[in-house]
UniProtKB/Swiss-Prot annotation:
The UniProt record lists the keyword Membrane: yes
Residues that coordinate or bind GTP: D14, H15, G16, K17, S18, T19, N131, K132, I133, D134
Lipid bilayer topology: Peripheral membrane protein
Family stated for the protein in its record: Belongs to the TRAFAC class translation factor GTPase superfamily. Classic translation factor GTPase family. LepA subfamily.
Gene3D superfamilies, A to Z: 3.30.70.240, Elongation factor 4, C-terminal domain, Elongation Factor G (Translational Gtpase), domain 3, P-loop containing nucleotide triphosphate hydrolases, Translation factors
Protein name from the UniProt record: Elongation factor 4
Example of a GO biological process term: positive regulation of translation
Gene transcribed to yield this protein: lepA
EC number(s) on file: 3.6.5.n1
Coiled-coil parts of chain: none
Amino acid sequence: MKHIRNFSIIAHIDHGKSTLSDRLIQVCGGLSEREMAAQVLDSMDIERERGITIKAQSVTLDYKAKDGETYQLNFIDTPGHVDFSYEVSRSLAACEGALLVVDAGQGVEAQTLANCYTAIEMELEVVPILNKIDLPAAEPERVAEEIEEIVGIDAMEATRCSAKTGIGVDDVLENIVTAIPPPEGDPEAPLQALIIDSWFDNYLGVVSLVRIKNGKLKKNDKIKVMSTDQVWGVDRLGIFTPKQIDTTELNTGEVGWVVCGIKDILGAPVGDTLTLAKGGSTERLPGFQKVKPQVYAGLFPVSSDDYENFRDALGKLSLNDASLFYEPESSAALGFGFRCGFLGMLHMEIIQERLEREYDLDLITTAPTVVYEVVKTDKTVLYVDSPAKLPAINDLEEIREPIARCNILVPSDYLGNVITLCVEKRGVQVDMVYHGNQVAVTYDLPMAEVVLDFFDRLKSTSRGYASLDYNFQRYEASNMVRVDVLLNGETVDALAIITHKDIAQSRGRLLVEKMKEFIPRQMFDIAIQAAIGNHIIARSTVKQLRKNVIAKCYGGDISRKKKLLKKQKEGKKRMKQIGNVELPQEAFLAILHVGKD
């Protein structure tokens, strides 16, 4: 056991985490030259394309150290994006140490910091590494000081390497062996294994990545999943060297994969504990929580024939993604579809892109909303994730909106812009600390503002230097209203949005102006109105197309012209009564972009 090292890599997006892991695999000979692909561990196309890591992955490498001993290195790859922070904390719980990889050109960023604090709270050994020292812009001394100031760990001895060219990678491996402690655990104790991640394989069912904390796991053991109390037989188990290799047992401290015929990913939730069915442990490992979606949106297939395929596609995606929530929803305007819950906007974009790309579907998305806590007049509390479910105004006591605690790291030159942005988004400042040239600002912002476009706006006001980390804090009573959109006096349910009363008027006006551009002109006037309850707050009109009916009268009598105009007017009136308006898909997208311009 003392020759095992479990570690993960903490790094901000694009600081070279996946490239470094490629190098480690190459040096330890996990894959032959021919099998090396760039970013071996990012197995989904979309992960490679966007250059981000979404799912946690693991690799077991054998490394012959300079002291002549052979060490088993278990490396668990973690996602870096803020939407996937729960997966990060699960990956860290399985390790004894973490490599803090920082780009020697850019310095420390907020998500790195957030994950690093998580690691320190879990009492992991944090080993700083300065990457990309081959770049002309690299300033390792300055960045080392920054790490010491902001994170507070000793970085003067930090290993310098360049994952791309391979300089210093051997030093990194030596550092892992010397600085990170071996796993603790009792091989004789009852089995306790932490599920780091689960995914669905078409042939094997659910494959779980586990870390054995105590005891050992053998083939054909009967095991129990502690949160569901279901018992399964272990069919196969083994390790990844990135390739799946079968073994007969996993010992204390090791990380490997287990297949036990579970059909549904909810049967092996991430962060849960496995133990033996007979004589197993009674206590589960700490830190398990059910992942709650933060953002909801309605997804509808463009043609209703696709509904069945869409349902199957969602089912297949949710096998692999336990944090995706969906339930059927129908809308008068859009037909049948699903209300889906996501961790954040990035997660939503990724799911939508995967549905369109892998399952060939055309989808319409309604405006994303967060979950509101609603107190009705009879004191019952509801959780509302869609504007359509909001009770009528006279039944409402109050609406509480979710508040997110946002930690922003920004160079002091851009502090003013960032504060202006936070105030505009109804933020309340909690804290501000200067670290050298960087400022750490903490704000409480409404979740609805954060998920809409806060991240994009933050990046643009700070020229891309600010970084953000947020998590849900609490519900707070707020003056929220539902803005409905009416076309010719009829409500279109799919276009409603929930917004704050102070900005409802301007949002409403923006919305109707935006929609006016997208609705094609008809033979009659179309009134687009935004309303709160029965109170109209904004209106614009798409003008009718009309034929010049008096063109054929040569200078004729005025009464003749009046007669023709009156006849046209009556015809238009009749059309307006029976005519209905087709909404193009662009009109729905207009709503999504209303806050962004």
